[in-house]
A protein has these predicted regions:
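Glycine-rich cofactor-pocket loops
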Residues: 28-31, 61-74, 285-296, 310-348, ...
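A short core secondary-structure module
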Residues: 186, 190-244
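C-terminal amphipathic alpha-helical interaction region
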Residues: 452, 468-593
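Internal maturation/activation junctions in enzymes
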Residues: 128-129, 140-181, 362-381, 388, ...
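Amphipathic, small/basic residue-rich leader segments at the start of a protein or domain
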Residues: 1-123, 147, 573-593
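Acidic, low-complexity proline/glycine-rich segments
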Residues: 1-24, 267-269, 274-279, 311, ...
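A glycine-rich, basic-preceded beta-loop-alpha segment at the flavin cofactor/substrate interface
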Residues: 195-197, 233-250, 255, 262-293, ...
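Alpha-helix capping/hinge segments and adjacent helical runs
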Residues: 4-5, 188, 258, 382-462, ...
C-alpha cells in the first residue's frame, strides 16, 4: 500500500474547521492567502510522498548506527533531509529577518503532519530544530540570534533539547549537570544527558544543543535551573565553524520503535556553552521549546494514525473473508463486515478530530502572537494554553488506539512485521511518553489551566460550542440535529465536571480525575470541531451524489457523536469519583511483596 499525503483533508480542516483564513485580517502574514496555502500543501505533500516516505521502512529495519563514537544516519536520510532543508521547509513559520518565510504556524504544522506521516523517525530531527528556533527567538541575545538562527532556520544546522538525566526524568528538579563560569562570560558544562533525540548525526554541519544545567550556588530544585547553548562545533564570531566542542554521544538506545531516529546519551566534559536567557530561568525558558514540541508530538499521533488507517482501509478493501451481513455476498470484503467498518469509522473520526484539535491550537498560537489588539491576543493565549495539553495527550492516545485498531483490521497478518502495520504501532507508542507524559499533560490541564484566568478559557470554549449547537439546530437537517443533541449533552457534562474539579484545585481528588477529564474535554473539543466541519460540508450536499466526500464529513461527525461523545457520562463519573479506592490501595493491595 502506498501512503498518500492527506492534502485534501488538511486543506478542509485548515479552511473550513479552524478558519485559518481569518489570520489574513491581522496583517501579520503578508502574502498569505488561499493560493499560497494550497501551493504549500501540494508541494509539501509531494516532498513527503516522493522523498521521505520511501525511506520509512529502511529507517525501521536498518536504524541509526553508533560507530566509533559517532552516529551514522540511515542510508538515504541525509539526502532526504537536504531536500527538506533546501526546499525551505524548515523555515516556513520562522521570522523573515532570520531567513524564514513568515507563514502561519498552523500551516507549518499541517506540513509537519505530512512529514511525520511519511517518515516519523526522520521528521523528529527538524521537529526539534523548530523548538530550538522558538527558544532562541524568544530568549536568545541579539548575538545568539544573529549567529545561530539563520543556520537553524535554513536547516544547515539542527537543534536538540537536553533535559533528561538518569535520575531526573519527569522530575527535572533532580538534575545534576553543572555549568561553571570560565571567566570570559561563557561557561563549561559537565554532566550526562540521556534520551536525547537526534543528539548526534551526520546530516548537518553542526548541532545546537539547548541544555538545562545548574550554576554554582543556584537554588535547589527547579528554581535553580538555567538554560545553556552548547554547539557540537564551536562557532566563531563571524559565523564560521571552529573546533569540536567537548561533548559527544556515548551510545544510542535500542528502542521499541522510531529506529531511524538516534536516541543518544550525551556526555558533556567541560563543554563550552553560552547562557540563554537569565540565570535560573532555564525551566521557564525551556518550556517555550517544550510547548512547541508538545504540539508537534500531538501531530505525530495524528500522522502515524493516518498512515496506519490508510493501510488498514486498503487491506479491508482487498481482503475477502466470510459472508457479508449486509449483502449476503460470499466471499465479502472485510469492509463489508459491520465490526470492521466500525473500527475503520472510529479510526477515521478520531483522526479528523485530533487533526482539528492540533490545528486549532496552532491557529490560537498564531492569534496570540498576531491578534489585532491586546484583548484578542490574550483570548488566543488562554485558548492556546488550554488546548496544548489536550492536543498533545488526546491526539497521541488516539494515535496508539488507532494504530492498534489498524493492526486488528489486518488480523494475524497485522502481527507479522512484513505487512508494516506493526511498525506503525511501535512508532506511535513513544508519543504519549516523551515531551511530557500524557499523565503530566492531564495534571497540567487540571492544575494550571482551570485557574481564574484559564477558567475563562474553558467558559469561552463552551460558549463557542454552544454557538455551533445553535447553528446545527437551525440547519433543519436531521443528521446535523442529531449531532447537536449529543454535543449539547456532552457540553453539559463537561461543565459539571469542570465545576467539580475547579472546586477541588490543588487537592488529590482533582489529580485523581485529571486523566479522564482530559479525555472528556478532548472528546468535546473533537466533537465540536467535527460538527463545524459537518456544517461546512452541508453546504455542498447538493453535490454529494457526484462527490460523496462531502457527505462523508457529516457521517464522520455523526459517528463521533454517537460513539465517542455518547461516552461522556461514564467518563465524567470517573472524573468525579475523586481519590476513592485509590487512597486505600497501597503496595500490598497491588500485589507487592
Amino acid at each position: 500500500m502506498t501512503w498518500r499525503a492527506p492534502v485534501r483533508d488538511l486543506n478542509f480542516a485548515l479552511n473550513e474547521i479552524v478558519e485559518i483564513g481569518s489570520l489574513a485580517d491581522t496583517g501579520a502574514f503578508p502574502g498569505f492567502d488561499d493560493e499560497t496555502l494550497a501551493a504549500v500543501l501540494d508541494a509539501g505533500g509531494k516532498l513527503a510522498e516522493d522523498v521521505l516516505a520511501p525511506l520509512n521502512r529502511a529507517g525501521d529495519e536498518i536504524g541509526a548506527q553508533y560507530e566509533n563514537g559517532a552516529v551514522r544516519s540511515v542510508p538515504g536520510f541525509a539526502h532526504a533531509y537536504r531536500a527538506f532543508a533546501d526546499g525551505g521547509w524548515n523555515g516556513l513559520s520562522a521570522q523573515t529577518e532570520h531567513g524564514g518565510q513568515g507563514l502561519p504556524k498552523a500551516l507549518a504544522l499541517a506540513v509537519f503532519e505530512m512529514v511525520h506521516g511519511s517518515n516519523m523517525a526522520l521528521g523528529l530531527c527538524p521537529m526539534l530544530t523548530q523548538g530550538a528556533i522558538e527558544a532562541l527567538t524568544t530568549h536568545g541575545t541579539d548575538r545568539q540570534k544573529q549567529l545561530y538562527l539563520p543556520r537553524l532556520v535554513s536547516g544547515e544546522w539542527t537543534g536538540t533539547m537536553n533535559l533528561t538525566e538518569p535520575q531526573a526524568g519527569s522530575d527535572l528538579a533532580a538534575l545534576r549537570t553543572r555549568a561553571e563560569p570560565d571567566g570570559n562570560g561563557t561557561y563549561r558544562l559537565t554532566g550526562q544527558k540521556i534520551f536525547i533525540t537526534w543528539g548526534d548525526h551526520d546530516m548537518a554541519d553542526n548541532i545546537v544543543h539547548l541544555v538545562l544545567a545548574r550554576l554554582p550556588g543556584a537554588p535547589e530544585g527547579s528554581k535553580g535551573i538555567s538554560m545553556f547553548l552548547a554547539a557540537k562545533r564551536l562557532v566563531n564570531d563571524d559565523g564560521s565553524l571552529g573546533v569540536a566542542n567537548d561533548l559527544a554521544p556515548s551510545r544510542i538506545e535500542h528502542k521499541l520503535g522510531i529506529h531511524g531516529s538516534p536516541t543518544c546519551t550525551m556526555i558533556y566534559n567541560a563543554a563550552h556553552a553560552e547562557l540563554v536567557g537569565a540565570a535560573n530561568d532555564g525551566l521557564a525558558n525551556m518550556f517555550t521549546m517544550m510547548n512547541a514540541a508538545r504540539l508537534q508530538v500531538g501531530v505525530q499521533g495524528v500522522a502515524i494514525a493516518e498512515r496506519a488507517y490508510q493501510q488498514a482501509l486498503s487491506f479491508a478493501l482487498e481482503r475477502k473473508q466470510g459472508r457479508s451481513a449486509w449483502t449476503g455476498e460470499y466471499p465479502a470484503r472485510l469492509l463489508d463486515h459491520p465490526d470492521v467498518r466500525r473500527m475503520l469509522m472510529l479510526m477515521k473520526a478520531k483522526i479528523e478530530a485530533a487533526r482539528a484539535i492540533c490545528l486549532a491550537t496552532a491557529v490560537a498560537t498564531d492569534f496570540a502572537l498576531a491578534g489585532k489588539d491586546k484583548a484578542a491576543r490574550e483570548r488566543a493565549r488562554l485558548r492556546e494554553e488550554l488546548f496544548t495539553p489536550v492536543a498533545k495527550a488526546w491526539s497521541t492516545d488516539a494515535g496508539v488506539e488507532i494504530t492498534s485498531l489498524a493492526l486488528q483490521v489486518h488480523g494475524g497478518m497485522g502481527y507479522i512485521e512484513e505487512t508494516g502495520a506493526a511498525q506503525h504501532y511501535r512508532d506511535a507508542r513513544i508519543a504519549p511518553i516523551y515531551e511530557g507524559t500524557n499523565g503530566i499533560q492531564a495534571i497540567d490541564l487540571v492544575g494550571r489551566k482551570l485557574g481564574p484566568g484559564n477558567g475563562e478559557a474553558v467558559r469561552d470554549l463552551l460558549a463557542d460550542v454552544g454557538a455551533t449547537i445553535e447553528l446545527l439546530r437551525s440547519s433543519r437537517n436531521d443528521r446535523l440535529g442529531a449531532i447537536a443533541r449529543r454535543l449539547e449533552a456532552a457540553t453539559t457534562t463537561v461543565a459539571e465536571a469542570t465545576e467539580w474539579l475547579t472546586a477541588r484545585r490543588g487537592q488529590v481528588d482533582a489529580l485523581a480525575g485529571a486523566t479522564p477529564y482530559l479525555e472528556l474535554l478532548g472528546n468535546l473539543m473533537g466533537g465540536w470541531l467535527l460538527a463545524k466541519g459537518a456544517l461546512a460540508a452541508a453546504k455542498h450536499l447538493a453535490d454529494a451524489d457526484k462527490n460523496p466526500w462531502w457527505s462523508g464529513r457529516i457521517g464522520v461527525a455523526g459517528f463521533f457523536a454517537e460513539h465517542v461523545l455518547a461516552r461522556a457520562p461514564g467518563i465524567a463519573a470517573a472524573v468525579m469519583a475523586g481519590v476513592g479506592d485509590l487512597s486505600d490501595t497501597g503496595p500490598e493491595a497491588l500485589g507487592a511483596n
